[in-house]
Structures are given as structure tokens and as C-alpha cells.
Amino acid sequence: YLDHGLGAPAPYVDPLEPKREVCELNPDCDELADQMGFQEAYRRFYGTT
């Protein structure tokens, strides 16, 4: 028996995605993220992730 009403499960949601988007909108944070990674760049601009 297949339940066709539910479809595929929802993809995993990254809890840091909203912060990643904030960093991407700041050109300086985005550039730093390319060099050292998003979490370190975000920490330097906005504090802890």
C-alpha cells in the first residue's frame, strides 16, 4: 500500500540558513565567507552563530 497523498519527505532544513542569507546580503561578509567559511565570517561581523 502506497500513500500517494504525502509525496516525498521534506528536505533537511539547515538551521543556519537565515544567518547564511544575512551574510550573503552583506558584500564584505560574503567575501570573507568565500575565504574562511560562512560561520567564521558571520561570527566576525555579527557575533556568535
From Swiss-Prot:
Post-translational modification (record): Gamma-carboxyglutamic acid residues are formed by vitamin K dependent carboxylation. These residues are essential for the binding of calcium.
Which Cys pairs are S-S linked? Answer: C23-C29
| GO process terms (BP) | biomineral tissue development; bone development; brain development; cellular response to insulin stimulus; cognition; glucose homeostasis; learning or memory; negative regulation of bone development
Start and end residues of each Gla domain = 1-47
Modification 4-hydroxyproline, positions: P9
MF annotations from Gene Ontology: calcium ion binding; hormone activity; hydroxyapatite binding; structural constituent of bone
Residues recorded as binding Ca(2+) 2, renumbered to this chain, are E21, E24
- Which stretch is the leader sequence? none
- Which keywords has UniProt assigned to this entry? Biomineralization, Calcium, Disulfide bond, Gamma-carboxyglutamic acid, Hormone, Hydroxylation, Metal-binding, Secreted
- Residues that, per the record, bind Ca(2+) 1: E17
Q: Which residues carry this modification: 4-carboxyglutamate?
A: E17, E21, E24
- SUPFAM superfamilies according to UniProt: GLA-domain
Q: Does the keyword Cytoplasm belong to this entry?
A: no
Highest taxon in the source lineage: Eukaryota
GO cellular component: a single term: extracellular region
Q: Where does it live in the cell?
A: Secreted
Question: Do you know which InterPro entries this protein is assigned to?
Answer: GLA-like_dom_SF (IPR035972), GLA_domain (IPR000294), Osteocalcin (IPR039176), Osteocalcin/MGP (IPR002384)
Name the residues that bind Ca(2+) 3.
Answer: E24, D30
Family affiliation: Belongs to the osteocalcin/matrix Gla protein family.
Q: What function is annotated for this protein? A: The carboxylated form is one of the main organic components of the bone matrix, which constitutes 1-2% of the total bone protein: it acts as a negative regulator of bone formation and is required to limit bone formation without impairing bone resorption or mineralization. The carboxylated form binds strongly to apatite and calcium. The uncarboxylated form acts as a hormone secreted by osteoblasts, which regulates different cellular processes, such as energy metabolism, male fertility and brain development. Regulates of energy metabolism by acting as a hormone favoring pancreatic beta-cell proliferation, insulin secretion and sensitivity and energy expenditure.
Supply the PANTHER family for this chain.
OSTEOCALCIN
Protein name (database record) = Osteocalcin
Q: State the organism named in the record.
A: Camelus bactrianus
Give the encoding gene's name.
Answer: BGLAP
